[in-house]
From Swiss-Prot:
Name of the molecule in the record: 2-C-methyl-D-erythritol 2,4-cyclodiphosphate synthase
Any Pfam family hit: YgbB
Cofactor: a divalent metal cation
Gene of this entry: ispF
Family of the protein in this entry: Belongs to the IspF family.
Amino acid sequence: MRIGHGYDVHRFAEGDFITLGGVRIAHGFGLLAHSDGDVLLHALSDALLGAAALGDIGKHFPDTDPQFKGADSRVLLRHVLKQIHGKGWKVGNVDATIVAQAPKMAPHIDAMRALIAEDLQVELDQVNVKATTTEKLGFTGREEGIAVHAVALLLRA
């Protein structure tokens, strides 16, 4: 059994939607990123890679590589899963906390969980996503960006 932790941050930029957990959410800003900016899937990918001792997403999908420009983070997550399976691991469960003052996440969490479960080839009850604010403190509280903490448990396949 292995545990990994992931953390990612993206700042807001021009745009009218963000993508979190594969779900497109209308918002007054987008997220600045080389890929699609899905900070939730990036943190989950890092947690999974860390648990399997496979480095991090920067190693596997460098932002200096043009092939990952605008990349769909769901595709990247599925690639991470293949890497983990290749090392003899399977996902036990994942848990993530989105830290954002806005937009409100509650209406989208069920859809995020469903897509993540599909991409990780696990049951819905093996995926948890929750959201919190920082009570208007710090960069997320000032609505400058979004942060996500994620934890993954891997089991021998």
